[in-house]
UniProtKB/Swiss-Prot annotation:
Gene: infC
Subcellular location: Cytoplasm
Descriptive protein name: Translation initiation factor IF-3
GO biological-process terms attached to the record: ribosome disassembly
Chief localization: cytoplasm
Family statement: Belongs to the IF-3 family.
Organism of derivation: Mesoplasma florum (strain ATCC 33453 / NBRC 100688 / NCTC 11704 / L1)
GO molecular function: ribosome binding; translation initiation factor activity
Length: 180
């Protein structure tokens, strides 16, 4: 069993470093970015250790020569994790909200539901407007579309239709998103 002192996850080593580099000859890039030329792997590792740094493989040339950089691997990993965390934080999450209507909804109820949809749209969410047909109401598809049109007219100043009204089982669904 793998013993870990601080119960952390094992490090997934994507980049070969130091002795884990397989190529016999490597093209070296110094710690400040200048090319030092091709060297044998052992000489390159020794050069990195003299500077108190690590040798990390950053690429491979078609002729089998590995491209390696001298750097502080701990600092490099920290910066990568920080960059990934920042990218994840800046990711925009769009939520789907749903408003349910019926064919014979009253005007005041329709306005109230439209206000709720307006709140969702102002928050940047995508809104699914579902109109449910009960019993024999499914025969009055035109009334359902008319109700959806009335609802959309209440919010059309801040919303645009992403997906037109489509019948799925007993629901007439339409998706709207905020205008940009």
């Amino acid at each position: 069993m793998d013993q870990r002192r601080n119960n952390s996850k094992p490090i997934k080593n994507q980049d070969p470093i130091n002795a884990f580099i397989r190529a016999r000859e490597v093209l070296i890039i110094g710690d400040n970015g200048e090319k030092l030329g091709p060297l044998k792997r052992n000489e390159a590792i020794q050069l990195a250790e003299e500077k108190g740094l690590d040798l990390m493989q950053v690429g491979q040339q078609p002729d089998g020569l590995a491209i390696c950089k001298i750097l502080d691997y701990g600092k490099f990993r920290y910066q990568q994790q920080k960059k990934n965390k920042e990218a994840k934080k800046n990711q925009v999450k769009v939520e789907n909200k749903e408003i349910r209507l019926t064919v014979n909804i009253g005007q005041h109820d329709l306005v109230t539901k439209a206000k709720k949809a307006r709140e969702f749209l102002e928050a940047g969410d995508r809104v699914k407007i579902s109109l449910k047909f009960k019993g024999r109401e499914i025969a009055y598809m035109d009334l359902g579309k008319e109700t959806l049109d009335r609802f959309y007219k209440e919010i059309e100043d801040i919303a645009k239709i992403e997906k037109e009204a489509k019948l799925t089982s007993r629901f007439l669904d339409m998706y709207v998103v905020p205008k940009k």
